[in-house]
């Protein structure tokens, strides 16, 4: 009788552990699928802000409650792959680049994250970004660019204007390599 109670108690303990593990797996799957996910940067288009092979923590739910904002670093679902870019203009904005200065709605935008790249371009005797615009961003779309303007496929040259529904989430933090952990917003 005591032996049978012991076996029943062991079985109940195993069942309890299996339920806990199952719940944890379902929780992780749902969290990753709908709320938060890792993303690996591929290429140098966001350098020096983000580097090739860095891993990011992406907030996938933020845009369920709000719209992308200028300056957000976002993950975009393309036809064949995902891209990481910075939001430069929102629907209705007029975007223009003149002599390496960005203008949104005829106001010059300070892009402090480009200082390193602008200095490098200046030393080469070139502009970091070719002149373009003015261009009005249509409803339901955003204009994005990579921080490495000389080496980025973005709204200027290949990706085109991005539908807001193609934005999968906002980068929040670099999580790997550990020595480079930092907020990205």
For each predicted feature, which ranges?
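Soluble "head" domains of membrane/secretory-pathway proteins
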Residues: 2-14, 26, 30, 48, ...
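Hydrophobic (often cysteine-bearing) scaffold residues that line and stabilize catalytic clefts
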Residues: 18, 23, 42, 67
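Hydrophobic membrane-insertion alpha-helices, especially the h-region
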Residues: 19-34
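Aromatic-capped interface at the extracytoplasmic side
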Residues: 30-46
């Amino acid at each position: 009788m005591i032996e049978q109670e012991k076996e029943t108690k062991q079985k109940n303990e195993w069942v309890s552990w299996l339920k806990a593990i199952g719940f944890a797996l379902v929780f992780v799957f749902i969290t990753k699928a709908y709320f938060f996910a890792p993303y690996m940067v591929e290429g140098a288009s966001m350098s020096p802000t983000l580097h090739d092979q860095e891993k990011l923590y992406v907030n996938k739910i933020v845009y369920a409650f709000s719209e992308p904002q200028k300056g957000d670093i976002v993950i975009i679902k393309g036809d064949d792959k995902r891209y990481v870019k910075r939001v430069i203009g929102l629907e209705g904005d007029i975007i223009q680049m003149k002599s390496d200065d960005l203008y949104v709605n005829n106001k010059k935008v300070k892009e402090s994250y480009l200082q390193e790249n602008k200095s490098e371009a200046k030393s080469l005797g070139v502009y970091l970004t070719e002149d373009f615009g003015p261009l009005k961003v249509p409803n339901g779309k955003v204009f994005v660019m990579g921080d490495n303007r000389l080496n980025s496929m973005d709204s200027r040259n290949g990706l085109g204007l991005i539908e807001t529904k193609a934005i999968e989430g906002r980068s929040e933090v670099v999580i790997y390599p550990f020595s480079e952990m930092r907020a990205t917003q």
